[in-house]
Structures are given as C-alpha cells and as structure tokens.
Amino acid sequence: MAAVVALCRKAMETVKTKEFRDYLASTHFWGPVANWGLPLAAFRDMRASPDIISGRMTTALIFYSMAFMRFAYRVQPRNLLLMACHGTNIVAQSMQAGRYLNYHYGGGTTAATTAAVSAASATSTGSVDSSATSTGSVDSSATSTGSVDSSAATTPAAEDPVAHSNCQEITCCYLVTWDCD
C-alpha cells in the first residue's frame, strides 16, 4: 500500500511541474491525441462488413503510420506517444487489410454470392442446388423432376449486380459500389 501512495505522490509532483504543463500545451502531446482517432476508428470498424474496406486507403494508412512511427522515434526529443499511436494504427490497419484480402480474395465474396444465388435459383426454378444437396434439404418440386442446378452459381450474370434491373452503379473516391433497391 505504501508503494501505491508513493507512486501517486510522485505522479502528482510530476503533473505539477512546468515541464509537464508545457508538454500538455505542445504539439508533441496534441498531435498524437488527434492521431489516435485513426486506430480507434479502425478498431471500431472491425465489426462492420468487410465490403466497405478500401484496400488502397488501408495500404496507404499502413505506409503512412510506418513513416511517422520512424519519425516519432528519430525526432529529438522522441515522441513516444506518437510512436505508440502509429504502432497501434499499423496493427489495426493490418487487421483490416487481412479482412479485406480474406473477403475479396479468400472466398468471402464468392461464398456469400454463391449461397444467395443458389437460394434464389432453387426457389425460382424449383430445382435442387449444390448447397441444398450437401445439407440434405430438397425442394419438393425438384424431387419430381430430379434436376440439379449447379450452373446458376457459376454464371457471370448471377454474380454481376448490373444484370439486375434495379441496380445503380455509384462511383466515389475510386470505390465502385452497387446500390440495389
């Protein structure tokens, strides 16, 4: 208990010094405080859908943070708060980059699209799709015809949002998205 009291006393003495007040009024403090918004936003977006992640911006933020992390270490006096902020941002952006790569190149998009297209084709054509046969569910009208529809999930028109008549292409900041009603 005495060690905690001594630590608190030492912290209070440090806070009361002119050097600490000058530090709180400097850009060495407020610059990193403002920069903490980047990693905090990245960690908050971990729960968001990975289709909103911009691969270009994530890559740019990783390189930006690496450059400023080196700067924070090399500048005199060293700005360890800025270095910690950018180190955290590198971790957060790397996690977002992993989510982006997994979604766009690791099967995240294809699996979601294939499941949606297979479900839609099974209900509209009355046939059994490849995912339904693997789970053991069979449409009652498909049992009479005995047809299996595995081509619907692999056709380019099934994965292309433009093929649907109620979709609009929206281009903003080098990111192309589809707005479907």
From Swiss-Prot:
The entry's keywords: Membrane, Mitochondrion, Mitochondrion inner membrane, Transmembrane, Transmembrane helix, Transport
Record Pfam families: MPC
Annotated transmembrane regions: 23-42, 52-74
GO molecular function, one term: pyruvate transmembrane transporter activity
Domain of life: Eukaryota
GO cellular component: mitochondrial inner membrane
Primary role: May mediate the uptake of pyruvate into mitochondria.
Family named by the database record: Belongs to the mitochondrial pyruvate carrier (MPC) (TC 2.A.105) family.
Name of the protein: Mitochondrial pyruvate carrier-like protein
Organism: Bos taurus (Bovine)
